[in-house]
């Protein structure tokens, strides 16, 4: 029995490579409060320039902490209760820091869904990350100070490294070099700043490519928020929140895992909380991924 569709539901937000009919494109994202400025620099090696970056080396689903507390973001700019039709009656969470309006309905059922998966989802995603298939890279063009820098251009994309070096702890080592994956569009935030070590990006609608196991899929991701926080030990921790399509995940389940579709398809409408349709039923499910990154370089 395949567990791929369950993994796609949890990891759809992580493969940030928007689909395009033609070659690479640059798409400007809206930037959150920490952003103001622009820069360009790097270290030249022959015809290539290596620029500082962060590569995400660990991705796990961020489950709820309790019935009312969960990590994540306010993806729909509203605080919903059980009577809110715009959220299809799904009550928002409060973050551990006390922020209200947190959308993370997948996290609320994560434990039960994890038990139903034949292969642990985290193991499947970790294998894809370590193989370089889910190399999520943030280029920090013009970075001078990872704690506070008012003149940085951010580029977010799926990176390419034929064989990343894996350390003794089972995750990618730092200091490795990545390229933009051939044909992958680059999402750009110019005039950006790092404030107190925090990066934050947001995007409304993107059609993303995701590759897990031997399958490649395109999934529509909405209301994406990406945030990383620099740490004293030189690593980066953060979250990625987004909405994933009920219809698309259901179609993938029917096609690639008929047995699992009997579990997945009835579950999704019951936790959907974003973008209600004409029938007042929500068409997307909010999800949050916890990210851990390490320093890297981008060669251009």
Task: Say what each PLM segment does.
Residues 22-300:
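Extracytosolic secretory-pathway proteins
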């Amino acid at each position: 029995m395949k567990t791929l569709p369950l993994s796609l539901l949890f990891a759809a937000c992580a493969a940030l490579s928007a689909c395009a009919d033609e070659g690479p494109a640059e798409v400007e994202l809206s930037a959150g409060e920490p952003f103001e400025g622009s820069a360009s620099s790097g270290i030249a090696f022959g015809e290539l320039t290596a620029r500082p970056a962060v590569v995400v080396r660990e991705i796990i689903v961020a489950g709820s902490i309790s019935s009312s507390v969960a990590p994540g973001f306010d993806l729909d700019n509203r605080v919903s209760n059980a009577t809110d039709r715009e959220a299809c009656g799904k009550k928002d969470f409060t973050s551990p820091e006390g922020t209200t309006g947190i959308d993370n309905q997948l996290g609320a059922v994560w434990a039960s869904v994890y038990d139903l998966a034949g292969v642990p989802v985290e193991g499947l995603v970790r294998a894809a990350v370590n193989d370089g298939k889910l190399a999520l890279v943030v280029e920090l063009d013009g970075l001078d100070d990872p704690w506070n820098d008012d003149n940085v251009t951010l580029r977010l994309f799926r990176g390419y490294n034929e064989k990343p070096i894996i350390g003794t702890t089972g995750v990618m080592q730092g200091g490795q070099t990545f390229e933009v994956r051939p044909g992958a569009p680059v999402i750009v935030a110019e005039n950006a700043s790092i404030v107190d070590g925090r990066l934050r990006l947001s995007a409304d609608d993107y059609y993303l490519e995701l590759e897990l196991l031997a399958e490649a899929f395109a999934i529509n991701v909405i209301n994406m928020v990406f945030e990383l926080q620099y740490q004293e030990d030189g690593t980066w921790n953060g979250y990625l929140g987004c909405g994933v399509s009920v219809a698309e995940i259901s179609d993938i389940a029917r096609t690639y895992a008929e047995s699992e579709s009997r579990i997945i398809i009835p579950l999704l409408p019951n936790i959907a909380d974003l973008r209600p349709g004409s029938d007042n039923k929500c068409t997307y499910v909010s999800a949050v991924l916890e990210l851990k990154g390490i320093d890297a370089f981008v060669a251009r």
